[in-house]
Design a protein with these regions (language model features):
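Flexible mid-to-C-terminal extensions adjoining Fe-S/redox cofactors in radical SAM and related proteins
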Residues: 188-293
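Short, basic, glycine/proline-bearing loop/turn elements
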Residues: 6, 154, 210
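Short linear motifs in exposed loops
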Residues: 184-185
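Radical SAM enzyme [4Fe-4S]-AdoMet core and its adjacent flexible, acidic
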Residues: 40-168, 174-178, 190-195
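Conserved SAM/AdoMet-binding glycine-rich loop
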Residues: 1-39
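Short, small-residue-rich loop/turn micro-motifs
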Residues: 35-39, 113, 234
Length: 293
């Protein structure tokens, strides 16, 4: 009996990968590395503390992944500065797929938001996000990367991810080695997303705290009436509370991109949206649910 234990997985910038490659092989670790696309911007934005470029070393380390027994993949976060070089991004995806051990079907895009970029990078508008999404489909639909562009590349914006929860505090947790528990990598070190410490607090208190904090974070802004009228609310749940509060907004920052993806992937609009809105408000909102009957 007991729990099934999975193999370890690490997220890494791949800079010091060569130091750990034997351990990675020994313990069958799967790897998710981060790269900037287009690659020439990696050297601009990902430098060492001593201002040294890192791309050449990272591409060498990608080659070391060839012989690891478990999965390896990379992801790229796209800001406006990357979006402005969309054709270069396409070229570099093809380059990585053809010339490295990476299968670029197993790759994912994230859409950057300004919170963590120290003012260096800027977020794309919703129109630019949709243009980016459509350009990737135009280029890769029907190609040897069709599986990727219609699957993992944009999966983060589908309902399989964390934002599909009514309350993500009921399901997702980030544990630090000192025992501190936060919501996730976005909420890490932010007191509004701190749930407690496993050495000092009971499990019950941590779970209650998690649920309550996410509820409060969703309610910092009033419920968006566009969301109330949207038949995809059952999939989106108004988006990530952390990002909404970072932007001072009350709807998902990738709203239009999500709607494109829902249509392309055949998700049905909810014909009983009014009933869903009532149940959602009852569970997740401070607004009077009676107004939504």
């Amino acid at each position: 009996g007991g729990f099934k234990v999975g193999y370890p997985h690490i997220k890494t910038n791949m800079y010091n990968l060569e130091k750990h490659i034997d351990t990675i092989k020994e313990f069958n670790v799967s790897i998710s590395g981060s790269l900037d696309l287009p690659l020439f911007l990696h050297d601009e934005y990902r430098v060492t503390k001593g201002n040294q470029k890192t791309l050449e070393r990272i591409l060498k380390n990608v080659e070391l992944l060839k012989n690891i027994p478990n999965k390896k993949k990379v992801s790229a976060t796209i800001f406006k500065e990357h979006y402005e070089h969309i054709e270069e991004i396409i070229k570099d995806i093809k380059f990585l797929h053809k010339n490295t051990c990476l299968d670029m079907n197993d790759f994912n895009f994230m859409i950057g938001f300004d919170y963590n970029s120290n003012g260096i990078l800027h977020h794309m508008s919703e129109e630019e996000q949709v243009t980016f999404y459509k350009r990737m489909h135009q280029e890769f639909d029907g190609s040897d990367l069709d599986t990727g562009v219609n699957g993992p590349w944009f999966d983060e914006f589908g309902p399989e991810y964390c934002t599909n929860c009514d309350n993500c505090g009921e399901k997702f947790f980030l544990l630090e080695k000192n025992g501190d528990i936060y919501s996730c990598v976005r909420g890490q070190k932010n007191p509004d997303y701190y749930y407690g410490n496993i050495y000092n607090d009971s499990v019950e208190d941590i779970l209650t705290n998690a649920r309550n904090k996410i509820f409060l974070n969703h309610n910092r802004e009033p419920l968006n009436e566009e969301c109330v009228k949207c038949d995809y609310l059952y999939l989106c749940k108004t988006g990530c509370p952390f990002v909404k509060n970072a932007y001072g907004t009350n709807k998902s920052y990738t709203c239009r991109l999500q709607q494109e993806l829902y249509k392309d992937r055949g998700y049905q609009k909810d014909q009983y949206n009014d009933e869903f809105v009532y149940e959602y408000v009852k569970k997740m909102r401070l607004e009077n649910k009676e107004e939504y009957i």
